[in-house]
């Protein structure tokens, strides 16, 4: 029997995949809610100790992940906004067309999508990304991050697991 997914048009999707978009929305809501709490209850760059290795520290990130390119001339805001928007559109199409039997890959894509959109909302509305989770050990500090960054990181780890360990086990013609 031919692969039913191959017969789908570009804009057709499997309705069961709406649950993965729900996971993306959950990541966005959790990210934006925690950023709002951090922005309204923390003073900028003033660490609040939580655990011996964790502070809440409100920071504004004008660059990419972990403040990469934050001191560039301002072009990075438009570049990362455009990149996140384009990748998000592609991920939505990819996500909606996943076969039903796949789980790890759509969870990975949904988390990356939710994280990218969470940070995109900040870039568009604020001109920077709100970071507030500050992890450290003694004098070794990891760059501040947020829930969106965590979703992207977890999604990327799951994507790598799927690519290197699970993809080989999938049947070639996975029907929806």
UniProtKB/Swiss-Prot annotation:
GO terms for molecular function: aspartic-type endopeptidase activity. Pathway: Protein modification; lipoprotein biosynthesis (signal peptide cleavage). It is found in: Cell inner membrane. One of its GO terms (cellular component) is plasma membrane. The keyword Transmembrane helix applies. Its main location: membrane. It is a multi-pass membrane protein. InterPro entries: Peptidase_A8. Keywords: Aspartyl protease, Cell inner membrane, Cell membrane, Hydrolase, Membrane, Protease, Transmembrane, Transmembrane helix. The active site is at residues 131, 149. Its EC number is 3.4.23.36. The chain crosses the membrane at residues 10-30, 48-68, 78-98, 102-122, 141-161. It catalyses: Release of signal peptides from bacterial membrane prolipoproteins. Hydrolyzes -Xaa-Yaa-Zaa-|-(S,diacylglyceryl)Cys-, in which Xaa is hydrophobic (preferably Leu), and Yaa (Ala or Ser) and Zaa (Gly or Ala) have small, neutral side chains. Pfam families: Peptidase_A8. This protein specifically catalyzes the removal of signal peptides from prolipoproteins. Belongs to the peptidase A8 family. NCBIfam families: lspA. This is Lipoprotein signal peptidase. It comes from Acinetobacter baumannii (strain ATCC 17978 / DSM 105126 / CIP 53.77 / LMG 1025 / NCDC KC755 / 5377).
